[in-house]
Amino acid sequence: MAGAKAAVRSLFDDLASEYVAQRGREFSFVSQKRLVLEMLAGVRGRILEIGCGAGHTLPDLLDMGLEVDAIDLSEQMVARASEHVRRHRPGGRCRVAAGDIERLDFATAQFDAVLLMGVLEYLPGQAQAIAEIVRVLKPGGCAVLAVPNGAGAYHIVRTLYRKLRGARDQALVGKPCLPWRLDGDFAAAGMRKTESAACNFIFFPLKDLAPRLSDRINRLLTPTARLPTAPLLGAQYIAKFRKI
């Protein structure tokens, strides 16, 4: 486990500069961020963002009037996120630090909300991470998350294609999550799902063969993110859970 975390930390240390330059402008991230912020509407008090990356969501959380704590496994991402907040929301109530989702350095029942995007898929197992999320949430608090959707068309077709070709993914590629399994894991930990959506409507191999057409289709389908059919097509699963 320690070796896997060190590898993930090293990967995102190396990606930090790229995240600063590109991540905030990518449509896949922008559409994902819009959905999670909609799910956080109405939250008051204190929020923890786990896996904050280069900090692209932090100004939005501050604009919502929230007191923000943010952590990332990567020290380089922490440095970029801290600078992003200083530049865009100087004086905002935001603390950024290195941290591990499986050992959160916060007391029990501290937060009104927890946000994590692109985190759970890098863990070999998710039980300890979910337990920590539940622990630091206040009763009635909510968790909003985004993960690759293992039930979506893109990941199903891509996985089947690679199996037929005998190809192997790189060790650090985030593993897509099955929505119903994730929902069940959170329910078992004392969290009730209150809403969900899907985004990033990309299709394999179109995304690689015709990226411009793929982007147009993605943008065309994005308004369907909350329809019941969205999890069948969206490559990203977004969900909100409330602590019972």
Where is each model-derived feature located?
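Conserved class I S-adenosyl-L-methionine
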Residues: M1-G42, R44-G53, H56, D60, R80, V144-G166, ...
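Class I SAM-dependent methyltransferase SAM/SAH-binding core
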Residues: A54-R103
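A conserved beta-strand element that flanks and buttresses the S-adenosyl-L-methionine
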Residues: L115
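A short glycine-rich, Lys/Arg-flanked "PGG" loop and its adjoining helix->strand segment in the class I
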Residues: A127-P139
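A C-terminal cap/extension of S-adenosyl-L-methionine-dependent methyltransferases
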Residues: R158-R162, G184, E195-I244
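Acceptor-substrate binding/catalytic loop of class I
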Residues: L164-R181
